[in-house]
Amino acid sequence: MDHLPIFCQLRDRDCLIVGGGDVAERKARLLLEAGARLTVNALTFIPQFTVWANEGMLTLVKGPFDETLLDSCWLAIAATDDDTVNQRVSDAAESRRIFCNVVDAPKAASFIMPSIIDRSPLMVAVSSGGTSPVLARLLREKLESLLPQHLGQVARYAGQLRARVKKQFATMGERRRFWEKFFVNDRLAQSLANADEKAVNATTERLFSEPLDHRGEVVLVGAGPGDAGLLTLKGLQQIQQADIVVYDRLVSDDIMNLVRRDADRVFVGKRAGYHCVPQEEINQILLREAQKGKRVVRLKGGDPFIFGRGGEELETLCHAGIPFSVVPGITAASGCSAYSGIPLTHRDYAQSVRLVTGHLKTGGELDWENLAAEKQTLVFYMGLNQAATIQEKLIAFGMQADMPVALVENGTSVKQRVVHGVLTQLGELAQQVESPALIIVGRVVGLRDKLNWFSNY
């Protein structure tokens, strides 16, 4: 380990920055946020420094570097564009045993500045030891996406409860189990983010009153249409907190690779070599695992409330009194149309869009008369096997035979394939496509040649 990561308490302590440009301004902003009593020494200053000085936030000393300014300092930063001056600052700080950072010259510095993820009072620092600042920045950006913005509020509230937790729970094991339950409670986190004091208090009292081995919960998460980059941040957070993930075949391998490594995985989909797990059995798996006290994620392709049978699964949990929540996902209609260059609505061609299941209950019938109406876009889910029937019915109820159609196979993924034609060809086109696939019918399909972008990548 080349550097010891430490967090410095600088509130009301003297610090010095030498330099008055943009780089110095960025460093000054960090020190001011930390509450430092800041002096800035430079020949010239960008306007922001004058603003801060006029507001009494820092002191400006105009002129060449004055090393006596270091005499009362705890920490210094050299941020000029003159290497000679920066080295003088470093040497003067070293002689006084004051830690000094030299911007873009880690070998001349006694400390380096990390990339920071600020969820105060929770702080995360990332450093490459000065060898690769860009890598440190990329890691910081990834961590920023993983850590909820309200995490700091949760940490601050936890600090307020420490004495009560210590008093109520006698052993370290009990306290640990309580805090694990506390920090994964989405209702509490959301209530804190919304400043809903009544809900915060109610959830807190429930956490303290529940036995530590209480039943778990189920989170219904939409995985999106395929591209792992379309998984929501909240969805990513949930699958990385799960004890067990129950998933179907529409969830891509790229997304499953993001699941917490030691989480159990239960496949309940239908694909070659596997039998389809009946819906009732899936419901019982969710119920059984939650009753063991586990955090269960039910991971579904697309959005769980759009032809995902999510409502049926939650009804079972609701009846059993199991806590649950839902994280929406980008539905296949949105993802596949966007990645195919087909806008679902358009001022000239479609004022509405209909999402339709092509997989009906026995004896079921769609409202073909309204589906055949003009100025709308139809998106059929699970419609490949019924493509010929869809073609026949729409034409029979008055839709023009030359209406553009498109079938999107493996939408949003690197395997995406789009075939298109007109309505009279729909049944034939469906023979060229494999599931999972989506059928889009409407004049907007004609814009594909102009708006297609994904196939160019």
UniProtKB/Swiss-Prot annotation:
Protein name: Siroheme synthase
Metabolic or biological pathway, per its Swiss-Prot or TrEMBL entry: Cofactor biosynthesis; adenosylcobalamin biosynthesis; precorrin-2 from uroporphyrinogen III: step 1/1; Cofactor biosynthesis; adenosylcobalamin biosynthesis; sirohydrochlorin from precorrin-2: step 1/1; Porphyrin-containing compound metabolism; siroheme biosynthesis; precorrin-2 from uroporphyrinogen III: step 1/1; Porphyrin-containing compound metabolism; siroheme biosynthesis; siroheme from sirohydrochlorin: step 1/1
Active-site residues annotated for this sequence: D248, K270
Binding site for S-adenosyl-L-methionine: P225, G301, G302, D303, I306, T331, A332, M382, G411
GO biological process: cobalamin biosynthetic process; methylation; siroheme biosynthetic process
Region Precorrin-2 dehydrogenase /sirohydrochlorin ferrochelatase: start-end pairs: 1-204
UniProt-listed Gene3D superfamilies: Cobalt-precorrin-4 Transmethylase, Domain 1 (3.40.1010.10), Methyltransferase, Cobalt-precorrin-4 Transmethylase, Domain 2 (3.30.950.10), NAD(P)-binding Rossmann-like Domain (3.40.50.720), Sirohaem synthase, dimerisation domain (1.10.8.210), Siroheme synthase, domain 2 (3.30.160.110)
Source organism of this protein record: Salmonella dublin (strain CT_02021853)
